[in-house]
Amino acid sequence: MVLPIIIGLGVTMVALSVKSGLNAWTVYKTLSPLTIAKLNNIRIENPTAGYRDALKFKSSLIDEELKNRLNQYQGGFAPRMTEPEALLILDISAREINHLDEKLLKKKHRKAMVRNHPDRGGSPYMAAKINEAKEVLERSVLLRKR
């Protein structure tokens, strides 16, 4: 009686693993090696001329604004967090800056923490940076007080 339940759970786990693996592979295969290196903050001293264009995203799965923001970002964190860096960490777009209030900031902070919380496999360092980004924007003149 317990055996069919165990088998069912095993099959379900395998199916979900395969599905997430295929989704990850779909995104991964659209990125060039230099783009992957750039996203992982790996510096390549002298990329060959044929690969210079590979630093730009070729994926249609990522919207244009995010492509531009990631292509301009040099990687790493500044010693003291700046407002542009905080906006990038919390994924606040240029359109949302005009409407940035406490409610939107809380929503973006929560979304980032859900994705990167240490209890769910995220990095404690990134969680600290997300909290720091929220604090920077709370003190910022960009935040509209109601």
Swiss-Prot record:
Keywords: Chaperone, Membrane, Mitochondrion, Mitochondrion inner membrane, Protein transport, Stress response, Translocation, Transport. The keyword Transit peptide does not apply. It is found in: Mitochondrion inner membrane. It comes from the Eukaryota. Residues 85-146 form the J domain. GO terms for cellular component: mitochondrial inner membrane; PAM complex, Tim23 associated import motor. Its main location: mitochondrion. GO terms for molecular function: ATPase activator activity. GO terms for biological process: protein import into mitochondrial matrix. InterPro entries: DnaJ_domain (IPR001623), J_dom_sf (IPR036869). Disulfide bonds: none annotated. Interacts with PAM16/TIM16 and is recruited by the PAM complex. PANTHER family: MITOCHONDRIAL DNAJ HOMOLOG 2, PTHR12763. Plays a role in mitochondrial biogenesis and protein folding. Participates in the translocation of transit peptide-containing proteins from the inner membrane into the mitochondrial matrix in an ATP-dependent manner, probably by stimulating activity of mtHSP70 (SSC1). Present with 573 molecules/cell in log phase SD medium. This is Mitochondrial DnaJ homolog 2. It comes from Saccharomyces cerevisiae (strain ATCC 204508 / S288c) (Baker's yeast).
